[in-house]
Amino acid sequence: LINGYGKAGKGDDIVIEACEFAETFLKLTPYLSVVLNIDNDHLDYYGSMGELKFAFKRFALMTQFMIFANADDKNTMDVMYTLDRRVRTFAIDNHADYRAININEYKPGFFEFDLKEWNTTDTTRIRLSVPGRHNIYNTLAMCAVCRFVGLSAEQCAEAALNFKGAGRRFEVYGECNGALVIDDYAHHPTELRATLNTAKEMGYKRLIAVHQPFTYSRTKMLFNDFV
């Protein structure tokens, strides 16, 4: 693919970012799965948070071996507690199998932390090359999965340092009349909040946000949260 949404590697495994919209993620039977959070999205389809959580439970039950879950997200853990499945957790604030401790903002908007694993007293320093506190959770999830499949903590640290971000995820387009132009695919209030907080953490003096509604139904249902 040229500027597409996939990248072909040389291994036997495939990594997919699955979406819960219209239960599309229920078409998958993953060997391992990661649940970062469960937010009030796609409720025009599901009708309630209860039905949305039930869909995530079905997805988790389709996971063949291990589920990795964010222990700081209540909705996620509400689902995990109902499962008869192997679950490993990651977190910043709560007790978990993989934790980020000694978090430091080494330059405005960019973070580093010590990776603390459940089965050792050793820690590994992880430095992120992408901005935003929310990316600590993304990196924790990566570390948890990679450690589980046999990569070293040092390899995880190297991967985190070398990862420069994905398209339309706080992507810098350039400058216009001295203003830095950044594009982000955030289309849910939680995502918008993370994007705006990242920009604020980076110390920009003036912030102008231009929001393009992604769907009419989401905008109507979550209008107050968007505001």
Language-model features, listed with the residues they occupy:
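Conserved motor-coupling elements within RecA-like helicase/translocase cores
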Residues: K7-G11
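Short, flexible loop motifs at catalytic/binding sites
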Residues: E23-L32
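Acidic, Mg2+-coordinating active-site environments of NTP-dependent enzymes
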Residues: L32-V181, Y204-R206
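Active-site beta-alpha connecting loops in nucleotide-dependent enzymes
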Residues: A166-R168, T190-V227
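Short, glycine/acidic-enriched loop or turn micro-motifs at the edges of active sites
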Residues: E20, N40, D73, A186-H188, ...
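Acidic/glycine-enriched edge-of-secondary-structure segments
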Residues: N177-H187, P213-S217
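Short beta-strand-centered segment that lines the nucleotide-binding/catalytic pocket of NTP-utilizing
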Residues: L1
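Switch II (G3) loop of P-loop NTPases
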Residues: D12-F21, V181-H187
